[in-house]
């Protein structure tokens, strides 16, 4: 570099440092300038942490930016550590051959060879290290060293300013709150780690709620923690990524869903399971809806979600001394949720009302940001106090509010949907309100308006048994829909026909699923087998299928995420619904994959032990019992997980049908097996509670005491630990009663293997080598015979296939056959059963055609 260039560069750096911007942003700009002027591929600034024994990456151009604030090295590690340790410049032409070279694969360092680092010193105090690197070997001369040293002197001043927290804390606080108010943080591992690091103990106690955490933490504590942990760079980087995410126009949706931009999809669901800190879900349906809108956000699908706000949510579960389920309902503090009033087109908070024969239902409307998606929640005090609580009268009022109220809320906000997607029949009344609006707006009769609205309706059914569909008597229908029926200009009989099956005669029951099927142009089941079952249940109705999937960033463990980053490419998550991305799984070293899995398994076991102890202490159990529970489960034993709703058809107790066989398995000294169970029974499901009690009793049986654990109060958090840490996921419903199931899909992403009846999604996923099957798919009309056959098949596959394969190790101690199956399950199923693929299917096969974007017709099976 010439003297003139040197002077110009120093002048430019001086200009940047004097602009008065935020220190972290200035530092980013300076390293970018240095890389350009030095013609290097990388320029990075590492700051000395307060303990003065570690460096942390604070700014970089060339390395992976997600490593800012995350990549740390001790002063005795690497070449950068050597610069700080010896407080002198270090120049190496071929860094990979130097004895102090340390490889950081997460930073993408494998491409860079030459290294020049100089200390950052301000007023005689070491602040950090400034580094440049190139992809080709290069010898840095005295002039290069002098030039970078001069630049470092100016950069050190910026670093000193960055450490002056008075100038830094206001934007940090502001950005922390901006991150907390959008649930995007819940599926961004780096942002989650920021909130956790602020106060790990309180974070866990608050059920991972950043709004509550920030409300409790005094400003001084935030300042102290941010300074101690060097969080500033991480916070700024997380905020910047959030803003880039929210405002990017280079998305899948921008290319494929443009027709939905002026008139978005209105997605209705009775529950949404987005995160454990927002407890308005009970189980699979809600978690699926949460995953649906997260992937819609990631893909940038124009969509607005509509649900209900349950102030007491679903119940908190605890078991009494006999193992019987008890339910507690807790009132949610609205101020501790990322909610704000929805604002209407008139600039005022939205309030809606619905007339019934027995009075007016009034509701407020809240808005929650879920990435790019608005989630609107209608709140009507007692009507929406509890999810799935109350009698038929409460239920119909909730569904009236969800459907009719949801459409009116959209209208009040100036939103005109181009597509109405009903996730199950609970929101079916929305179509009637949409018809009324079309009649009013365009001067049409009911019969004229129906075809127009029907074309825009997508209906998803999740229930494979007739008894599972909501039905209401004629009196309840007339009481609650009478005024709407009057506005539609139809008779009571005509309205009842819309929800009645043929041949029901005068004993009319209004079925919400029938309403959804009759008033939708496109209807789908949620797996291939469920499509077959649904078409048999509703003969003559063209029901296709779109198989459910799960949101990858939500359910994938951070350790596995980093593993995929290294082997699938840094942007693999942007294309997780494409099969080609997952081929790289085969390139992962067996040992690396296995060690990652064992780490997650250890984390699960520690979590289960803590919960088991907490449960025992709450019940007042003896110190001896508590001590025993602190040691439950072995990290070396084959660990099988089962977690889901405790409905009797899911047969949580199938494994108990032959206690002698089960006992021999769990107590085998050479090849032991252990089980972790979790799940809730519906408060009115006494048989389901009985099954749960059977499972819980094994924790007190000496033969099974340390091999069977029931984790109380199953929620998204418990589910996350289980699906990320188990070796095997057990699923044994009575075929064909499982519409899809998604918990096993979450296990796939983390390398666990499914052991399942060929029902729901597993019927189309299993290929003989990517997991294990219970039976061959045969059923029997006699329930006891059916269960006996399946239990025998379960014991057989455990004894003959699962257990031997897990414990078969090579000379390195690795279960190569098991790992081969792990890789196959990830490679063959990771792309097929994730929510990105699912939402892309809905968009191309239902949303775009429903909005008039294509002329394609829905086939029976799509």
Regions found by a protein language model. Give the residues of each.
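A short, aliphatic-rich beta-strand micro-motif
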Residues: 113-121
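Short hydrophobic/glycine-rich mini-motifs in sensory/regulatory modules
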Residues: 120-130
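Regulatory sensory and allosteric helical modules in signal-transduction proteins
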Residues: 48, 54-58, 65-103
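Short beta-strand-to-loop transition segments that serve as allosteric relay/switch motifs
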Residues: 63, 129-138
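Catalytic cores of carbohydrate-active enzymes across secretory and cytosolic contexts
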Residues: 166-862
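Allosteric cytosolic regulatory segments
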Residues: 149-157
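Short regulatory alpha-helical segment in sensory/regulatory domains of signaling proteins that mediates
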Residues: 14-21, 30-39, 45-49, 65, ...
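Signal-transmission linkers at sensory-effector interfaces
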Residues: 1-25, 36, 127, 158-165
């Amino acid at each position: 570099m010439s003297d003139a260039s040197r002077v110009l560069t120093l002048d430019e750096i001086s200009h940047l440092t004097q602009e008065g911007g935020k220190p972290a942003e200035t530092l980013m700009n300076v390293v970018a300038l240095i890389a350009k002027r030095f013609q290097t591929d990388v320029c990075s600034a590492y700051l000395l942490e307060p303990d003065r024994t570690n460096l942390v990456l604070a700014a970089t151009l060339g390395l992976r930016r997600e490593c800012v604030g995350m990549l740390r090295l001790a002063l005795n590690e690497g070449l950068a550590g050597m610069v700080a340790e010896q407080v002198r410049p270090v120049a190496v032409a071929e860094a990979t051959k130097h004895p102090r070279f340390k490889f950081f694969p997460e930073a993408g360092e494998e491409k860079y060879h030459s290294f020049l680092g100089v200390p950052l010193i301000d007023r005689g105090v070491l602040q950090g290290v400034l580094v440049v690197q190139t992809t080709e070997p290069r010898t840095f001369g005295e002039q290069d060293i002098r030039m970078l040293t001069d630049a470092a002197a100016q950069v050190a001043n910026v670093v000193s300013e960055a450490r002056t927290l008075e100038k830094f804390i206001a934007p940090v606080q502001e950005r922390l709150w901006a991150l907390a108010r959008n649930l995007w943080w819940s599926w961004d591992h780096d942002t989650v780690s920021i909130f956790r690091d602020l106060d790990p103990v309180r974070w866990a106690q608050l059920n991972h709620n950043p709004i509550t955490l920030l409300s409790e933490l005094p400003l001084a504590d935030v300042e102290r923690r941010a300074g101690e942990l060097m969080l500033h760079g991480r916070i700024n980087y997380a905020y910047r990524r959030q803003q880039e995410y929210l405002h990017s126009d280079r998305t899948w949706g921008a290319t494929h869903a443009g027709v939905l931009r002026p008139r978005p999809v209105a997605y209705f669901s009775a529950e949404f399971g987005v995160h454990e800190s927002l407890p308005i879900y009970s189980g699979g349906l809600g978690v699926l809806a949460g995953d649906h809108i997260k992937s819609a956000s990631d893909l940038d699908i124009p969509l607005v979600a509509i649900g209900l706000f349950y102030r007491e949510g679903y119940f908190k579960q605890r078991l009494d001394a006999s193992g019987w389920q008890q339910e507690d309902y807790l009132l949610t503090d609205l101020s501790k949720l990322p909610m704000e009033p929805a604002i209407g087109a008139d600039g005022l908070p939205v309030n809606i009302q619905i007339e019934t024969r027995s009075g007016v239902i009034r509701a407020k409307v809240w808005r929650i940001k879920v990435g790019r998606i608005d989630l609107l929640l209608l709140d009507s005090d007692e009507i929406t106090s509890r999810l799935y609580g109350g009698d038929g009268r409460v239920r119909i009022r909730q569904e009236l509010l969800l459907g009719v109220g949801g459409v009116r809320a959209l209208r009040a906000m100036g939103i005109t949907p181009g597509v109405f997607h009903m996730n199950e029949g609970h929101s079916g009344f929305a179509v009637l309100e949409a018809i009324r609006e079309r009649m009013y707006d365009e001067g049409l009769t009911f019969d004229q308006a129906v075809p127009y609205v029907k074309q825009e309706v997508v209906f998803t059914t999740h229930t494979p048994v007739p008894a599972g569909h909501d039905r209401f008597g004629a009196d309840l229908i007339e009481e609650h829909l009478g005024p709407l029926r009057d506005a539609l200009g139809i008779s009571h009989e005509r309205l009842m026909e819309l929800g009645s099956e043929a041949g029901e005669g005068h004993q009319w029951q209004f079925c919400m699923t029938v309403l959804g099927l009759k008033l939708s142009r496109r209807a789908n089941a949620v797996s291939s087998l469920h499509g077959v079952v649904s078409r048999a249940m509703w003969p003559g109705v063209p029901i296709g299928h779109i198989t459910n999937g799960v949101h990858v960033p939500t359910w994938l463990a951070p350790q596995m995420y980093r593993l995929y980053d290294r082997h699938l490419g840094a942007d693999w998550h942007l294309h997780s619904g494409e099969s080609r991305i997952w081929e790289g799984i085969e390139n992962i070293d067996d040992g690396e994959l296995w060690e990652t899995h064992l780490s997650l398994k250890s984390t699960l076991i520690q979590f289960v032990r803590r919960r088991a102890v907490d449960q025992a202490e709450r019940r007042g159990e003896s110190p001896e019992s508590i001590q025993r529970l602190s040691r439950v489960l072995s990290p070396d034993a084959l660990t099988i997980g089962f977690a889901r709703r405790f409905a009797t058809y899911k047969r949580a107790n199938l494994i108990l049908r032959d206690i002698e066989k089960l006992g021999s398995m769990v107590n085998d000294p050479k090849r032991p097996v252990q089980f972790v169970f979790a799940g809730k029974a519906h408060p009115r499901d006494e048989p389901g509670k009985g099954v749960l009690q059977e499972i819980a009793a094994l924790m007190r049986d000496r033969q099974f005491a340390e091999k069977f654990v029931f984790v109380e109060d199953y929620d998204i958090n418990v589910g996350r630990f289980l699906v990320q840490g188990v070796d095997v996921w057990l699923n044994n419903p009575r075929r064909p009663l499982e519409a899809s199931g998604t918990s096993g899909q979450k296990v796939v992403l983390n390398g666990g293997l499914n052991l399942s009846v060929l029902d729901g999604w597993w019927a189309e996923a299993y290929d003989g080598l990517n997991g294990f099957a219970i039976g061959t798919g045969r059923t029997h009309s006699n329930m006891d015979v059916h269960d006996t056959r399946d239990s025998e098949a379960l014991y057989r596959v455990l004894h003959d296939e699962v257990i031997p394969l897990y414990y078969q190790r090579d000379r390195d101690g690795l279960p190569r056959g098991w790992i081969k199956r792990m890789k196959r399950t990830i490679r063959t199923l990771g792309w097929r059963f994730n929510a990105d693929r699912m939402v892309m299917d809905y968009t191309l096969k239902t949303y775009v055609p429903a909005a008039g974007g294509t002329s394609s017709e829905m086939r029976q099976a799509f």
